[in-house]
A protein has these predicted regions:
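Catalytic cores of secreted or luminal carbohydrate-active enzymes
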Residues: 298, 302-366, 375-382, 387
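The feature captures the conserved acid-bearing segment of alpha/beta-hydrolase catalytic domains
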Residues: 250-310
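N-terminal cap/lid segment of alpha/beta-hydrolase-fold proteins
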Residues: 43-93
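Primarily recognizes the serine-hydrolase "nucleophile elbow" in alpha/beta-hydrolase
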Residues: 196-261
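Cap/lid segment of the alpha/beta-hydrolase catalytic domain
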Residues: 114-193, 246-259
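C-terminal beta-sandwich/jelly-roll accessory domains of carbohydrate-active enzymes
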Residues: 375-450
Length: 450
C-alpha cells in the first residue's frame, strides 16, 4: 500500500505570526540580499574533483566504491568529502543517478546506495557529517576500515561539532569568514556547496546520464535536499524527508501562546530569511518534489511544510505522511521515495494525483465533514481521515474519524465540542501498488510493501 495525503490541510482557523523579525543591523556592501546573490559566484563544476578511490568491490550485482572528492578550498585549506558510490554491474545503458544525503549524527549509507543500485540507479551517499581528525565523533562512512581517509573540512567546520554554525551569520574561527557577518558563515551554505559538488561527481561518471539526476535526504539531509534543489537545476527530482520547511526563524502564535522560533539566528535575521530560509528557496525549485514526513515531526513542521511547498512554481508536488509519529516513517511512506524517483528519472509509472478534498461546514446536523475524492490510477485500498483542534503541530492529537466509502469517494464527520477552536483535517489514501516493492536493503525491512 502506498500512502499519499492531501495537498493542503482543511483549516477553519490557523493562527500563525507572520511579522518580519529584524534587528536593525547595518549591512556591509557585499552582503547578499537574495538566494541568487548568495550563490552567484559559485560554480559547482569549476574546480577539478581530484577523486580518490579508497576502496572498490563487487557485491550483489553492483560495483561499489569508497571515494573522496574535493569540495573546495576555504581559508587556504582544501576541504574533501568522503562518500560511497555504486552502480549496477554490466549496465548496458547510461543510468539515472541519485544522491542520498544523510541526517544529523549519521553517515554515508551503503544500505541507501544498495537500495538504489538494485533499482537500476547509480547512487552516491555523501558523508557531510564526517571529520578527518580532532576531537568529537569521526562519523566514517558505513563499512569504513581503520585508517581510511574521511571527510576533512580543512579550514572550516560545518559538521555537528560546530552546532552553533547552523543558525549563525556571524564570523568565527570555524566559519567561512573570520572578520565579518555573512550568510556564507552559515553551516548550511558550506554543506550545500559540498552536496552540489556531489552532483558534479555523479554527472562526470561515465555510466551516468547527467540529464537524469535526483536527490533525497532525511532530517538535516531533508534540509539539504531543499537547498540543493533550490540552487541547482541539474536536479530533476527531489524527495526531502522530515526537514526542509521554512519560517524556522519566526515565532509562531498558537491558541495556547507563542512558541519560540525553531532556530534563534545569530546575526541579521532578515538577511538569513532572504538568503538561507527555505521559503526563499522553494520559489526557485524547478523539479518535481515529494515530501515525506510525520504529522507531529519536530523538525519538518507539518503546517510549514505545506506553506513552503506551496511556493514551488509549476512543478508536481506530493506529500506522504505517517500519522501520530515524530521523525519516523512507516514503510508505506518510505516506499514513496523510490517510486517518485522511478517515475521522473527511470521510466516508472506516474503516481496517483493528490486526492481532492473539501471541508463541508454547512450540514443538517451542524457537524463539519471532510469529503475526499481519490485518484483511482492505482487501485484504492482505503482512506483514513483525521481531525484535530490543537493548533500546535508538534503537540497536535489527530483523532481518527469514521469513514464512509462510496466508490473512490470518502466522507467523515468531524464533531466538535466547541466552535471557537481551530479545526484541522487531513486524509491518507492507501493505494495498492502495481507490484510488491522491496526495501530489504535498508536495515529493519523484511516484507515487501504491496
Amino acid at each position: 500500500m502506498f500512502r499519499l495525503t492531501l495537498g493542503s490541510h482543511a483549516i477553519l482557523r490557523c493562527l500563525m505570526a507572520l511579522a518580519l523579525v529584524t534587528q536593525g543591523r547595518v549591512q556591509s556592501a557585499d552582503m547578499p540580499g537574495s538566494v541568487g546573490e548568495l550563490w552567484a559566484d559559485f560554480d559547482p563544476r569549476r574546480d577539478p574533483l581530484e577523486i580518490e578511490v579508497i576502496r572498490e568491490w563487487q557485491e550483489d550485482g553492483g560495483e561499489f566504491r569508497h571515494v573522496r572528492f574535493l569540495v573546495g578550498t576555504f581559508k587556504g585549506k582544501p576541504a574533501r568529502m568522503a562518500a560511497l558510490y555504486g552502480f549496477p554491474a554490466n549496465a548496458d545503458r547510461k543510468l539515472p543517478a541519485v544522491m542520498h544525503i544523510h541526517g544529523g549524527g549519521q553517515r554515508a549509507s551503503l544500505s541507501e546506495v544498495k537500495l538504489l543500485v538494485a533499482r537500476g540507479y547509480a547512487a552516491l551517499s555523501v558523508n557531510w557529517g564526517g571529520r578527518g581528525g580532532g576531537s568529537g565523533p569521526v562519523n566514517a562512512v558505513e563499512g569504513a576500515e581503520t585508517g581510511d581517509p574521511n571527510t576533512d573540512w580543512g579550514g572550516v567546520d560545518p559538521s555537528q561539532c560546530n552546532v552553533q554554525g547552523y543558525s549563525t551569520l556571524e564570523p568565527g574561527p570555524l566559519q567561512y569568514y573570520e572578520d565579518r557577518e555573512h550568510p556564507k558563515n552559515n553551516n548550511w551554505y558550506l554543506l550545500t556547496v559540498g552536496c552540489r559538488r556531489g552532483l558534479t561527481f555523479l554527472e562526470q561518471q561515465p555510466e551516468v546520464d547527467p540529464a537524469r539526476l535526483g536527490v533525497h535526504g532525511y532530517s538535516m539531509g531533508g534540509n539539504l535536499t531543499m537547498y540543493v534543489a533550490g540552487t541547482d537545476d541539474r536536479v530533476k527530482a527531489a524527495v526531502p524527508a522530515v526537514g526542509g520547511q521554512g519560517w524556522r526563524w519566526q515565532p509562531h502564535e498558537f491558541t495556547g501562546g507563542v512558541a519560540a522560533p525553531q532556530d534563534r539566528i545569530a546575526g541579521d535575521v532578515d538577511v538569513f530569511r532572504r538568503t538561507l530560509s527555505f521559503e526563499s528557496y522553494a520559489p526557485l525549485i524547478r523539479c518535481p518534489v515529494l515530501h515525506r514526513s510525520a504529522t507531529n515531526d519536530f523538525h519538518g513542521v507539518m503546517d510549514d511544510v505545506y506553506r513552503t511547498n506551496a511556493l514551488i512554481p509549476g512543478q508536481p508536488v506530493r506529500y506522504s505522511w505517517t500519522p501520530h509519529m515524530n521523525h519516523r516513517l512507516a514503510p508505506e511512506v518510505e516506499i514513496a521515495m523510490p517510486l517518485w524517483l522511478d517515475h521522473f528519472l527511470n521510466g516508472g509509472p506516474p503516481l496517483p494525483e493528490t486526492p481532492a478534498a473539501a471541508l463541508v461546514l454547512q450540514s443538517a446536523d451542524g457537524v463539519p465533514r471532510l469529503r475526499v475524492q481519490a485518484d483511482a490510477t492505482w487501485p484504492v485500498e482505503r482512506c483514513e481521515i483525521f481531525s484535530s483542534v490543537d493548533s500546535d503541530p508538534l503537540a497536535r492529537f489527530w483523532r481518527s474519524a469514521d469513514v464512509v466509502r462510496d466508490g473512490d469517494s470518502f466522507t467523515a464527520a468531524l464533531p466538535l465540542d466547541a466552535v471557537d477552536t481551530p479545526l484541522f483535517a487531513f486524509a491518507n489514501v492507501y493505494h495498492t501498488l502495481p507490484r510488491p516493492e522491496s526495501l530489504a536493503e535498508l536495515p529493519g525491512h523484511g516484507e515487501p510493501v504491496r
